[in-house]
Amino acid sequence: MPFSTPHTTRPKKITGLRYWMLRVLEECEHVSADFGPDPVHDLRVSLRRCRSLADGLMALDPDPDWKAMKKAGRRLFQRLGALRDVHVMIEWVEKLNPSEASVAQASVEAGDSPALPLSQQIREFIADPTDPKASPNDPAAQALLEILQRREQEQQHEAQTALEEFDRKKWRSWSKSLPARAARIRMGSALFKHLALERWTTAGELHNRAMRNRSQVAFHSLRIGIKRFRYIVENFLPVEHKAWSNDLKEIQDLLGEVHDLDVLWSTAVSCQVFPDEDSRKRWREIILSERTKRIDRYRAKMIGPDSLWQVWRSALPQGKQIQVLATRRMKLWANGLDPDFPHSERVASLALQLYDGLLASGWQPSVDAASARSSLFAAALLHDVGKSAGQKGHHKTSFDLIRAHGNPLGWQPADLQRAAIVARFHRGALPTRKHKTLRDLLPDEQKATIQLAAILRLANALDAAHDGHIRRIQIENVQIGVEKSRKARTNRFQRKPSSVTANEAVVIVAEGYSPTSSTAQTIAAERHLLETVLRRPVVVKPMRNPIEPRASQ
């Protein structure tokens, strides 16, 4: 905030998550002893740092304690928010008071009436007609300060209750366990750059909206968006933070002051503190002038080809690297939930080999082929994340987790939503169009989802033993989807091999497959859905002459 400074004099050496979590406990003690602006501000800063660290790390680490810690910190942070707003508004009233009560602040800073709340100190000074240095009091300022004084006292009681209800024992326990998990991910990693790009993209959209309509809501949302971007840079990208920290802080402060002014005006209007229209107009002009100065400064730094937006964007992932990093993030998240993630990676490879082989044979999914392939890949990688909650019904848990996880930048939301449903049907009951997860989809989308689920079920069966003995597969007879009578020729040679007949089986040869193994029994049971989709039998047999592995995503 624009006026408060930390009340401690010790150097602010930042040493990571554990430092900030212990700092929260320390600042709780300070606030319990003094509900003044600086202790409250410092506690909220410490809570915000812990929450922002959790926000970044929980995008990569699925440990539920991140969410629990963030929730506990948010609850205390929010319950202190009203008191902090009162403090900020008091400071703004003193600064903007048309009767120039700047001497009042000097008196406060000199230590007069230290036992009184800030609002009462300023109010008593402004209202003192015997002070020779005081200028005539502004009625609106006095009325607003009276209201803020009452609110300050009320919110101090709320803050005291919030501190008493804050579970410091649990917080201290998290301060020991969570920093160890955070240390597993290297600061400055490209994964954090990808996360920063996500935040940058969201903030950029909010910037465009704020520049179009300039509403209070738009600028408040922009402030939050830039704050979230700043925290990722500040917490996880030390090189970029060293280069950008001053600009990021200035931009956030400008928008923070715009927000403070908007809150001050809304409070003054709602409390009807203006004695007449002239007073209202005078205050409106003062607040609008201060607000405009800050927005103009923001625009000067954030609009144009050489703006800070472009400087920040140039240092973040570009082009194909974005999807590569998105996939790495998805794998890291899944690896923290899936008890046998190497199995899921093998299933993903086999699923793509089967999918590509079917495409080469002439089969086509009912939706865009590239989009369907992306969905299949994601579903295969993530199909067992539900095992983190137990084996029973884990396919349903996987569905819920994938849908709730969100969409990393570089992946299409529709592809991942489809992947969640495909993962849901990698085992258990066969999918039907009437199932609740499918019935609201368009017919082509229903069909594609069932097609991909059929491929995933067979790919999963191919590694049913979880030992990787089936390494790669190939469809032996091709041209599934081409009519037999179609014989396009070039120089008397067929352009493609002849298609199989309507009832001929699709033969899949698999390196490492044994027809006498337990895996063969699982394959025989799980191939039914693919046979239904392709409308022909599916046969799996050993590969006689192993081929080079087909490139996969």
List each language-model region with its residue ranges:
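A short amphipathic beta-strand at an alpha->beta junction
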Residues: L534-P549
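Active-site flanking loop/helix segments enriched in acidic
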Residues: T8-T9, G188, A326-R346, L381-K387
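Cationic, histidine-enriched alpha-helical/coil surfaces that engage anionic ligands
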Residues: M1-L325
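A short interface-forming secondary-structure element
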Residues: E504-I523
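Short edge beta-strands and adjacent turn/loop segments
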Residues: H469-V482, R495-K496, V500-A505
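Divalent metal-dependent catalytic cores for phosphoryl transfer on phosphate-bearing substrates
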Residues: H343, Y355-I475
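Intrinsic, low-complexity polybasic segments
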Residues: Q105-A106, A110-G111, K484-R486, R492, ...
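Short hinge/gating elements
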Residues: F229, R328-D338, H435-Q446, E511-P515
